[in-house]
């Protein structure tokens, strides 16, 4: 069973949100998108530690700056789906038989709705119900008992940097039998791994597993509320770097086909660690939903990679939040969700499964995920043909007082990956875009591609396309008053009887296209803003306008 959809109306900082989820998702967005409100909602409503949550007055949304305009109604709908048609009949879910609803796609789902009503006297009422696929309440007896069973089967564990963990005041001393169980599980996993063909000694395996325990109980532990003296792994490895390397090898061993038993042991180890460190007790049938909050806050990128690989081995649904380009480079783009606060809602943008063809997906994975993962945080992409344009455009924008990084604008060259996949991807992810093309034959084809994507809408074309009235960037800048730079680099006198193309070719041979572009951009900087071609100034204003439209 997985949590398939979260719908929130009027809860804390979220006016309206509809979020589809898969087995693993990474959520990104700017600071005000409502991350804390979403994670709080899941943590409070599906917590294994607390009894059923009752809404309070502070849970109701109000318009920013207008606390008197606080809403009096909120509702949250959590949709759970069986992983395969027919799975709802297995023993684990039998107690929830009355809550399942058949759907047209042959899957059964549980629609769990919570409503909050705030009275004029400040009193708050919390209502719970299970719905059918048409949104009508099901005649379920003992709704609260059913909800408790649902939470027992799929509790939320919120894992975050141990520095920010919430201290549990009572029951911080771990139960000794649990500590012994953990030691036995570690020993068994070490013996299991030692029987497999690999190049680690028994001691190295144990050192790697020690790093695993250290990671699970320290770096990703909110439930780990015990004091330092109660930690299971008291002594840190003398050579921590080597331990992480061994853990990386162990991860890869467990990730191989036929290693399901090792994953089960790993899950048991993870569960026992959590229970040994606090008052938390998980049901034997529980398959927790992990909320991993900004895992990069305390991990070096290499360690982050190893830690993320370890979490990938746990057979559990996971929702992570991050501000790290490093983590995004480790995540398939179809698992990334961009959340953007708009005036009336928080919009969730995603590629989703099957969002791109296999070839386009491969191009995006290489061009964006592996080489420019941080561009997924951008508000607007300015797509240019190559490296020359990247150098010139960034520098000229700076001369005009536009700081692209601060505005959330990323200049991305598209010649290597193709224009169409990038535009399609940007649209699916809610990233604004603008294309700059040359005036040569290739540029005209790119312009035609943009127009076809915009259905030849003239107004849209004005917002999304700028075409150079010249063969390429070099010819354009030559005509815009920078001929002397080309002559200087080509080591030619100003009035030499030679056509423009030959002068530019000679200048490129004397340096290179990127170096020539930098020379032109630096000269523009010396001359001031008036030297920046009006075409570019107009384009910069449009791109900044697009970016700000998304940010507001």
Pin down the residues of each PLM region.
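Switch/communication elements of ASCE P-loop NTPase nucleotide-binding domains
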Residues: 1-27, 32-47, 245-371, 448, ...
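Conserved P-loop NTP-binding catalytic core
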Residues: 40-106
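Extended helical coiled-coil dimerization/tether regions that scaffold
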Residues: 165, 174-288
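Charge-patterned, long linear interaction tracts outside catalytic cores
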Residues: 238-244, 393, 398, 487-552
